[in-house]
Amino acid sequence: MREVSDPLDLIKEWTVRDDDVEFVSGSHERRRLGLLLLLKFFEIHARFPSNLEEVPDGVVDFVARQAALDAMSLESYEWDGRTIKRDRAQVRDFLGFRECTVAEADLLVEWLVGNVAASERSFDRVKAALVGRCRSERIELPASGRLDRMVRSALSQAEDAAIATVARLVPDNVAERLHALVDDDIDDSSGELSTLGWLKSTPGNVSLETMLVEIDKLRRVREIGLPAGVLDSVPSALLVEWRRTVGVESPSHLRRRTAESRVALLGTLLQARERELTDTLVDLFIATVHRINARADRKVTKELVEAFKRVTGKENLLFAIATAAVDAPDEPVRDVIFPAVKGGEVTLRELVYEFKSKGPVYAQTVRATLRASYTNHYRRGLIELLDVLEFDSNNSMHRPVIDALELVKTFKDSRVRFFPDDAEVPVHRGIVGNWASLVFNNDLPERRVVRTVYEICTFQALREQLRCKEVWVHGADRWRNPDDDLPADFDERRVEHYTALRQPLDATEFIDTLKAEMDAALSALNDDIAGCDWIDIADRGKQGPIKLSPLDAVTEPSSLRALKADVGRRWGTIPMIDMLKEAVLRSGCLDQITSTASRDGISPDTLVERLLLVIYAYGTNTGIAAIAGGEHGHSDNDLRYVRRRYLTNDIAQAIAVEIANATFAARDPEVWGAGSSVVASDSTHFRAFDQNIFTEWHARYGGRGVLIYWHVERKSMAIHSQLISCSASEVAAMIEGAIRHSTDMAVEGNYVDSHGQTEIGFGITRLLGFDLLPRIKRINHVKLYRPGPKRPGDYSNIADAMSRPIQWGQIAEQYDQMIRYATAIRTGTASTEAILRRFMRSNAQHPTYQAMIETGRAQKTVFVARYLRDRQLQRSVNDGLHVVESWNRGNSVFFYGKGGDIASNRRDEQELSVLCLRILQTSLVYINTLLIQDTLADDRWSRRLTDADRRGLTPLFWSHVAPYGEVRLNMARRLDIT
């Protein structure tokens, strides 16, 4: 028998009512308890138990006591035969249910097909919908096997119906071109990709060649001519499934499908690839324009540095030159000036180089070099880009750049130096300022516009406006119309969205609350600062007004070292594969797996073993080929097949989430304390292959690679991971993980370092309803804003750190729009990074940006005022970040293969490696949690740990784990854990 986990559930589900007793009173005394159990079980599950083993422990006695029946009478109850059939019929009649006939089963499947199975593709959720439908229709649930067959039938029929609809909408000539995509496979002799493989391939590194290849791909996709809207009727969940399926199938696999299925899958691929390629080209454009500028800057700097030697004593030098010139004004320079200077001509040349290396001459030289680089190399790709991308803007202020692009396209093949006099040249902010002297030629009688320089300035202006999404691209996804990022139903569901964010509908109420918090925090700091010997606020000029003493170092308690040693003695050295196996078997996380293919010829036990090995191969970065040689009986091809068909990134994410949830459920509060609602997040750098547009140079880490952004809670369990580029916003990554981690944890606060906080970040997190708790590196320069106008005597003890009042009027005016953006992040209508692009400094004049900044400044003031006077908060932030830093140290221990480099240029492969590493480390934390609890249950440890020991207790250690060596997977060998 299973157990009832919660006593409240026992009371809620198995309480006997008076009418229940009356219902069984007419039956023979020996049948009453069995009949009553059938009744209560059916009320809970809408089906009957097949035997007594399905009834939870403790239920029989609980029910018998309530009904004043003898529990022993159940021993004579027959669970098979005419009696129980009669009892079941009685229960159905009493509750108003009926058996599920063949006709009703067909109707249920038909209902699933029309209402659920197309938009929801999860087997478990479709099954739950079927169970709910049976209850509402008062139909007894079919047997488990029959129920599963009904669900599978509904999923299949819904997909077939969608496929048929798409196939009807695709013209015959387009269908022929789609079929032609799978006519060829990889050429084994040359190794060249098939046409389909080429279209699915990822872009190379940022270069002109990559840009031209991606342009060719986009043109090839568009040449097929898939009609617009042909897939609009297909639910997004089914499109995601089709996209995943066609992504892993080769041309030969697709050829074995029906023609209709092939058209639907390939059409889905082309629609998705058109958006992806458009996004990629925008990324390449932004990176290329930046590269042109950066390389010109480096080239000029290198040339000048090589010739540069700083000249000292310039005042004396100037005096000597002036004296010589005045004394002999008519003599040649070489005869008068050179001899007057120590070092002669050489010194004067060095002075010229020094002047050129800074100021306007240097900038002018950089711009000239940039022009040459653009004209001689990059122009070809950037101009061709204009033929395949359509730019647009919703803001009339930025229309001149769009008009300028049309002018550039008009003269793209022209060789003239200047635009013709009759050409209408749009004036935009990219051609004014420092570039004006190069854009406009003033040597001619009439001022003329230099065409190539104008193109450069236009592309630079376009880049800046794309980055903040003031200019957007038709047919893109990440770079689409920013209005599409916002929830379309916001106006109709405004109250619901405000309630979900726990924000008031009235802007005045929001402002009054925030203003009161500011005043309370500032007043508390002002009143308490005299007693806080760790903080001093005074005017220190450039050093900043705030002086905060560092926290005292805390050493690891000796008892914790002894505890870890005891764990090692009791269980010995545990191979990492066994830690993973134990976590998977105990958590049941592989129950979440659904295949990306339709056929399943692998037994569940074999599938579990192969998945464990693939996860281990990716998580350790050793690779499948290395793991295939271990003691487990699975070949390289077997493992690669399972990887391709079963282990998607979504499934790996679900596995990690299930292990985290299992850890939370297994924790003993007496050991670990109450659950926390605060996480810490930080990034760490991984070197990675760089023949892709995602890998970037990171100045702080000094190498090319990617960043992994982790969210880890106080007891060392990672709840979220993200693979981001080195230039990505860590604030966006922080918000994304805090609200979309999918675990059972409710996040109410987030510790970050300086890279994870900005004033925009403070504003967004305030609206989203959780606290941003940063460790600010340059806290000495932080300014505290006033909640209202300055008055004599206000905050006099902290006056040197005070700044201007918050502009509450801007917040009130843009409050609803800010809530709209926060709702977009909460509901996921667009990625957090896409939303936050609207709040970049280059878009500082946007009114919503200004309002968000003011909100962030107010919230940051509240936090900093609390932080400065609360030593415990400082330590909590520091301890939380120490946990995520310890997690980062573990990365190098377990991700040891190939020198720790992510050895793939494919984004999905890189993400899977990170997810599998997360699975390994969450498995370690899960099993260590159980090992520690078992160890502390020993009488020797019952009173040994102090409060300080318990605060420092962590399951993130690996002194007893063997991450290296031959992989020996034995599913029968289990760890002896309670």
Residue ranges with predicted function:
Residues 2-518:
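Long amphipathic alpha-helical coiled-coil/heptad-repeat bundle
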Residues 20, 565, 597, 604-613, ...:
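Glycine- and acidic
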Residues 34-35, 56-57, 619-630, 636:
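Short, charged amphipathic recognition helices of the HTH superfamily
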Residues 46, 624-627, 679-685, 734, ...:
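Short, conserved catalytic/metal-binding motifs centered on acidic residues
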Residues 73, 77, 629-667, 671, ...:
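Catalytic or ion-translocation cores adjacent to nucleophile or general acid/base/metal-coordination motifs
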Residues 520-630:
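Structured, charged N-terminal subsegments at the starts of enzyme catalytic cores
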Residues 685-696:
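Flexible, glycine/threonine-enriched loop-and-boundary segments that flank and lead into catalytic domains
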Residues 800-978:
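Long, compositionally biased intrinsically disordered regions
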